Amino acid sequence: MSDKDFLNWPFLEDQHRQLAVELEAWCEQTLEQLPLDHSDVDAECRLLVTELGKAGFTANAVPAAWGGNTEKVDVRRLCITRETLGRYSGLADFAFAMQALGSISLSLYGNETLREAYLPKVAAGEYIAAFALSEPDAGSDVAAMRTSARLEGDHYVLNGCKTWISNGGIADYYTVFARTGEGTGSKGISCFIVDADAHGF
């Protein structure tokens, strides 16, 4: 099987094949010209997200209602984007992947106010998203999570420790999972959007 044979798989459509062609051309014309020497990975990630946004590729990470390229987030488009970027630059692949991972919970389950506030900026490559799930004692065993969220008046106060935060330190907002206590195990976990400049963060 050649590097492109997978594009003929029956569950891919012409739009997916066209995406692969367009992204390949972008990688050759734009990505390879960017100043990526890994001397400042944080700045380079932001540059990559900005450039991917200008080209319309970060719009694959959110639904069309908030600036995305398709009605719903299409995992096939995400996979093709990551596979293509990964052949040219692992950092470009990572930068794109975290946009999708850090916003998918919001795309699927967020309220309209939050979706309107964050998703168009993710689609445009203007915001960097982060994903904060793992903890020192709760990595693959997510149900062992200890970070808590307590309702105080009209807002929640989160308390806990996260580790291995994808895009930690450079993100504009964080998708943070915390225990709200409605049930045992994973049934008592909720997702919060936390701005990078939030008090106490």
Residue ranges and their predicted role:
Residues 147-150:
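A structural signal for short hydrophobic beta-strand segments in well-ordered beta-sheet cores
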Residues 28-55, 68-70:
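Short secondary-structure junction/hinge motifs that connect adjacent elements
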